[in-house]
């Protein structure tokens, strides 16, 4: 059975723009290679917004060298980027953006959500790219709720959505650059779930709502449990109804050099990213 190496969380929220009050639950700045290929996870909300005249969100900003994965639980957001791609995602939908060689993008509450108001709840996960893929062309994947496999758990314990990777016979729709899994799980109170994950892969369990026993440890709302890579068996038991994410992936074992919105493999590549951005060499819409 997997052992918990550490439990991490953050009670303090900070604003990303004027639309996303987030708690950063983990980051490569503190966990480094231990969390690879994942870089960070921000949990936004749940937060209530009244109807508004002006749009809320975060304006155009750059990224290079990694991917952002946005999972919406409540509310609705719109995304536009410098490749001309974009879209609107609502409850259950996922936006998987590969910044790679460089992209400029903006994220706002949708016009519909802005005008009606409501509760916003979402996760944004950063996933590192192998150094060989960091300068690939950007890519945007819209994964609608209807296209994400839903699997009923044994003993009517709940439901697992396969966003990326494989669970049993079910393959998630996300195209990834390295072997990894992102599973969105609802586990009912008092129920148990056992998962077998690849030996040697990083494993983290993110609790968004509820309280969960992970092995011998209790993990609470807005906390992340980092587990060992040696034992493939992950044992979970819900103390009450729990919403959680299971993140698993093959470690990249490459240098992680980050500076704000850029994550590369060397300081020289960071300097080049800054120079390219400042000189308008990121992809721009025609």
From Swiss-Prot:
Q: What is its EC number?
A: 1.13.11.24
Cofactors (names): a divalent metal cation
Which keywords appear in this protein's UniProt record, sorted alphabetically?
Answer: Dioxygenase, Metal-binding, Oxidoreductase
What SUPFAM superfamilies does this protein's entry cite? RmlC-like cupins (SSF51182)
GO molecular function terms attached to this record: metal ion binding; quercetin 2,3-dioxygenase activity
Quote the catalytic activity from the record: quercetin + O2 = 2-(3,4-dihydroxybenzoyloxy)-4,6-dihydroxybenzoate + CO
Metal-binding listed as a keyword:
yes
Output the InterPro entries linked to this UniProt entry.
Pirin, Pirin_C_dom, Pirin_N_dom, QDO-related, RmlC-like_jellyroll, RmlC_Cupin_sf
* Pfam assignment, any one: Pirin_C
Free-text function comment from the UniProt entry: Putative quercetin 2,3-dioxygenase.
This one is known as: Putative quercetin 2,3-dioxygenase PA2418
- Per the UniProt record, the source organism is Pseudomonas aeruginosa (strain ATCC 15692 / DSM 22644 / CIP 104116 / JCM 14847 / LMG 12228 / 1C / PRS 101 / PAO1)
């Amino acid at each position: 059975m997997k052992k918990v190496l550490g439990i991490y969380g953050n009670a303090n929220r900070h604003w990303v723009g004027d639309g996303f009050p987030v708690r950063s639950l983990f980051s490569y700045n503190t966990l480094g290679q231990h969390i690879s290929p994942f870089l960070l996870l921000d949990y936004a909300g749940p937060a209530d917004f009244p109807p508004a005249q002006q749009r809320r969100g975060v304006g155009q900003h750059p990224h290079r060298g990694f991917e952002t994965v946005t999972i919406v639980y409540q509310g609705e957001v719109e995304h536009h980027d410098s490749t001309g791609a974009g879209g609107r995602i609502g409850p259950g939908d996922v936006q998987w953006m590969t910044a790679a060689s460089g992209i400029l993008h903006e994220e706002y509450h949708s016009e519909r959500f802005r005008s009606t108001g409501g509760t916003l709840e979402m996760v944004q996960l950063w996933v590192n790219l192998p150094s060989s893929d960091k300068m690939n062309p950007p890519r945007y994947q819209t994964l609608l709720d209807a296209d994400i496999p839903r699997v009923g758990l044994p003993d009517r314990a709940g439901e697992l959505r396969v966003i990326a990777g494989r669970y049993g016979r079910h393959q998630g729709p996300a195209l990834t650059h390295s072997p990894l899994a992102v599973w969105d799980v609802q586990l009912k109170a008092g129920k148990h779930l056992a998962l077998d994950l690849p030996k040697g892969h990083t494993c983290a369990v993110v609790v968004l709502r509820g309280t969960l026993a992970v092995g011998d440890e209790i993990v609470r709302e807005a906390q992340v449990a980092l587990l060992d890579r040696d034992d493939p068996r992950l044992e979970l038991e819900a103390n009450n109804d729990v919403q959680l994410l299971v993140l698993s992936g093959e470690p990249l074992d490459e240098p992680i050099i980050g500076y704000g919105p850029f994550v590369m493999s060397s300081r020289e590549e960071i300097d080049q990213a800054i120079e390219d951005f400042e000189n308008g060499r990121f992809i721009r819409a025609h």
